[in-house]
Amino acid sequence: MMGNMFGSSLASLFFLWATIQQIFPNHLKIAIKEFFLSTIQQISFAKRFSDKFINFFSPYVQINFSEYEDYRVNHAFDPIETYLGAKATDKAKHLRASQVRESKGLVLKRDETKVRDEYEGIRVWWEMETDSAGYKTLKLTFHRRSRDIVTNSYIKYVVEEGKSIDAKNKKMKLFTNNPSSHWGSSKTSFWRYIDFEHPATFETLAMDPKKKEQILNDLAAFNNGKDYYKKIGKAWKRGYLLYGPPGTGKSTMIAAMANLLNYSIYDLELTAIQNNSELRKILTATSNKSIIVIEDIDCSLDLTGKRKKKESNLMIWRKDGDQDNEENKSFVTLSGLLNFIDGIWSACGQERIIVFTTNHLAKLDPALIRRGRMDMHIELSYCTFEAFKTLAKNYLDLDSHPLFSKIESLMKETNIAPADVAENLMKKNRETDADGSLNDLIESLERKKKVQIAQVDEHKEYSNKIVEAFRKLF
């Protein structure tokens, strides 16, 4: 009796499935099929035969591409999303428009969650799903008879095409890390970002021309060094230490590097990281072709080279107002940071530049900045006359002027940051002319000269008093 009922039900299911195959479009068929199979699997009698049912009724295979996998960015996700976004925009009903910097036209992309694609005579379906936390998964569905073509050829094709489209329309991004207290699961984004559109270039950078050329040559060698780094057995990365007084152009230099190489920037805030494990997680979630920046590293960590023995080489900092709260301490060891710079973990990624900046080079631990770890030390000091001429060209469109000689003489005697020079040269209003801007700079230089002379005299007087006091003692 039960066998007859089951046979009758099975015949009905066959008829229903055949009808669905004929009437409904593919995406709807797949959705109905999923509901149909899940219903069958709830029937106790059918559980023993569920695999056979699924194989019979579901000839489709599904591959999921999550945005994040095990705390790391899934590097296949973005190229696939780009490829699908650009797919047949002339036929799509919903589009997204954006404009890349220095591009004359708009970049149009699909803004639909479902896309059908064809490749070498086979048909596949893509669907984008977003969970409650906002993290995305791309689902690829195809017939099982196409498995070999899809897995061996199609996916690779899609990723390469997506990368090619990205290279043409790439938007650089400026990332900053989320506090570790906001990391909820392995899918949580460690970084948030905005589009990076800084105008700085090496052409507009105010610095000694010879030093500028040296940096450009070094960056070019790095950018073209894939085979060389592989040959010598080193990770394809480069470290730069930028040091000098405030206002000398360290942040501008980083922006110029990014624009030159078309790299995104990861601005790493170390005080938001609790320990070495979190440091590894967040750094392995960065992309290739990027610049990882730790600005004012002497302020971020205790790297003065005078760590107390009882702290066992431990760098400690506390959030403001939490000095007495043990739970709010953040711990990162020097070895943990160094391990990512040039240890085993440094190989996790390619084409990466690591930049440290500091206003106080002498405060840093020698182990952090030794040659080979930070490959190039770049001093960005006070404004020279050559740097001034670059700024004068940028701000006033001047190659020469009668006041240049006086400015050159004052700059030999006075320390002034390039940022201060730029502030004086910038036109305050429409009536300000070149003469007015240059005279403003001369006045600023003369004021600084007086202050610096007074400071020198004060220092000499103080030193003389100390010497005299010692003479009286002995």
Curated annotation (Swiss-Prot):
UniProt xrefs under Gene3D superfamilies: 6.10.280.40, P-loop containing nucleotide triphosphate hydrolases
Pfam families: AAA (PF00004), AAA_assoc (PF14363)
Claim: Signal is one of the keywords in the record: yes
EC number: 3.6.1.-
Reaction(s) catalysed (UniProt annotation): ATP + H2O = ADP + phosphate + H(+)
Induction, as annotated: Induced in roots by salt stress.
One GO term (biological process): response to salt stress
Enzyme class: hydrolase
Keyword annotations of the record: ATP-binding, Hydrolase, Magnesium, Nucleotide-binding, Signal
Highest taxon in the source lineage: Eukaryota
Cofactor(s), by name: Mg(2+)
Any GO molecular function: ATP binding
Record: residues binding ATP: G244, P245, P246, G247, T248, G249, K250, S251
Signal peptide coordinates: 1-25
Family membership: Belongs to the AAA ATPase family. BCS1 subfamily.
Protein's recorded name: AAA-ATPase At3g28610
